Amino acid sequence: MTAILDTIESPCDLKGVTQRELAQLAAELREKIITVCARNGGHLAPSLGVVELTLALHRVFDSPADKIIWDVGHQAYAHKLLTGRRDRFATLRTLGGISGFPKRCESSHDAFDTGHTSTSISAALGFAVARDLRGERNKVVAVIGDGSMTGGLAYEGLNNAGHLNKDLVVVLNDNEMSIAENVGALSNFLNRTVTSEFVHTMKKDLEGFLGGLDRIGHGVLKVAKRAEESLKGLFTPGMLFEAFGFEYIGPIDGHDTARLMETFEKVKRFDDAVLIHVLTKKGRGYPPAEEKPALFHGVGPFELETGKVIKGKGGAASYTGVFGEAIRKIAAEDERVIALTAAMPDGTGLTPFAADYPTRFFDVGIAEQHGVTFAAGLAAEGYRPVFAVYSSFLQRAYDQVFHDVCLQNLPVTFAIDRAGVVGSDGPTHHGLFDLAYLRHLPNMVVMAPKDENELQHLLLTAIEHDGPAAVRYPRGNGYGVSLDQTCSVLPIGKGEILREGLDGALLAIGSTVYPAREAAEALAAEGIDLAVVNARFVKPLDRDLILSLARTTGRLIIVEENVIQGGFGTAVLELLEEEGINGVKVLRLGYPDRYVEQGEQHELRAQYGLDAPGITARVRTFMKG
């Protein structure tokens, strides 16, 4: 039953809802979110944890005039349901459906697109300054989780915002994942909730009064502030945020709608920077998610009654799992190997490694920049660090890859998971740029395996290489090929011919190799005889092999699960130009110059012509042209 929710078309409709009805509405929101996530998958636990917070924000503030910016955005499902997207919520994270993250193009209530962490405070400050420049009076609210506070960008935003002292509200959603609990009765007393406008005004007036008493008043004010800060700093995070120039309020029960609304109503009258610390529970209202919040943080389809995740077909190992086992095998033979991750030990397959080698495993938090430079320092001291990271998140540390790793030619291995299209999380999470943004860095070796067995060999190849190396591999299961018991070093810059052919050559990299070979077999039945190459390396290229095929066949088809601009195909064109080879017809297959939408991996590959039937059709047209 969603009787109240069915009447909510916009946040304005919340104004007349009673406190009792708000409690019922919270239950209806949770029911809707759980039901849709059970079918579609999604970020269930974060969204369940902020239902009351979302209701209070939209009850008190006037979106879209007031701007609410959700950090990361995976906790915004209740927000979507309350802002006119209830009827489309069943399409969440599906091809053509609504996004799992805030999207400005989707609703005027989505003030800022998000998907990566720690961006909200900086963005909110931009909104606040723009408001002041226009002489307007609307409020700006950033909602950020404690996990996102491990990212340096959040503190850069806090530092600048506190310095400017703009009218800005930051809501710190502490869901017990990162920030420790406060200690003792004195702590509770010193950080009791300050929701009274009177108390806030009195403090300002007292500061003004003491400041006006010349030297004596200033002395008293300094002593009072030192005493307050010294005691508060012993027990609470309040001193930290006040040092940044924010008024600190909290902690507050994030599931007490009445208390939240009272606090927001009072803070709404303030005109300086305020941070409100709320305590919530991830997965609230769904026992399986409460018991295993990490599992249900981002989860696939699951059984509604039990919470059991529905497994896919077949028994092929995932690329992530193969990587995790391979690095354990390699580390057993090489004590120099150290594994690092940025808050993704499960997602990158490093949890077993952490159990086996706790002193050689480091989770740096949501801090990719730090992680890369940390790895560079380890490499400079003779270790062989492996930084396991999603392709999309490595983008956050590009300068560190350039300045701290490649410039010094340090042996850091980048194990780049989720390369290519990743599915329902959409454009913020697709890994479609790494081939392009890595291959032009001097000293960097860039490689991609055709299957899960080759992954473990390329991983060892990267670790043994005396310089920076990146191995990129897709999300999902492999092909079920047998896995060699030992890993071998492969010659760098050498591909392999999988099929001979005289009419042209398909040069494929990584996840496109198998569909390219399937396309070649289909075209052979039509009398089109194509060679198929597993390139393995985007940098350095197998120059001799590519040039030989260009000269003997006259037609090259390059296939990559990456943007076409600057990728593998571009590298081949540059090689042909450097060697002065003219008259070779080239077809580049990859993703176009746009941000690719959400959808299942197989749907997106079919839509962009990068599955076997799509490659077959496009190559057929090319060969007959």
UniProtKB/Swiss-Prot annotation:
Mg(2+) binds at D146, N175. One of its GO terms (biological process) is thiamine biosynthetic process. Belongs to the transketolase family. DXPS subfamily. The keyword Metal-binding applies. Its cofactor is Mg(2+); thiamine diphosphate. It comes from Geobacter metallireducens (strain ATCC 53774 / DSM 7210 / GS-15). The lineage of its organism: Bacteria, Pseudomonadati, Thermodesulfobacteriota, Desulfuromonadia, Geobacterales. InterPro entries: Dxylulose-5-P_synthase, THDP-binding, Transketo_C/PFOR_II, Transketolase-like_Pyr-bd, Transketolase_BS, Transketolase_C, Transketolase_CS. Its EC number is 2.2.1.7. This is 1-deoxy-D-xylulose-5-phosphate synthase 1. PANTHER family: 1-D-DEOXYXYLULOSE 5-PHOSPHATE SYNTHASE-RELATED (PTHR43322), 1-DEOXY-D-XYLULOSE-5-PHOSPHATE SYNTHASE, CHLOROPLASTIC (PTHR43322:SF5). Homodimer. Pfam families: DXP_synthase_N, Transket_pyr, Transketolase_C. Thiamine diphosphate binds at H74, G115, H116, T117, G147, S148, N175, Y286, E368. It comes from the Bacteria. Catalyzes the acyloin condensation reaction between C atoms 2 and 3 of pyruvate and glyceraldehyde 3-phosphate to yield 1-deoxy-D-xylulose-5-phosphate (DXP). SMART domains: Transket_pyr (SM00861). Pathway: Metabolic intermediate biosynthesis; 1-deoxy-D-xylulose 5-phosphate biosynthesis; 1-deoxy-D-xylulose 5-phosphate from D-glyceraldehyde 3-phosphate and pyruvate: step 1/1.
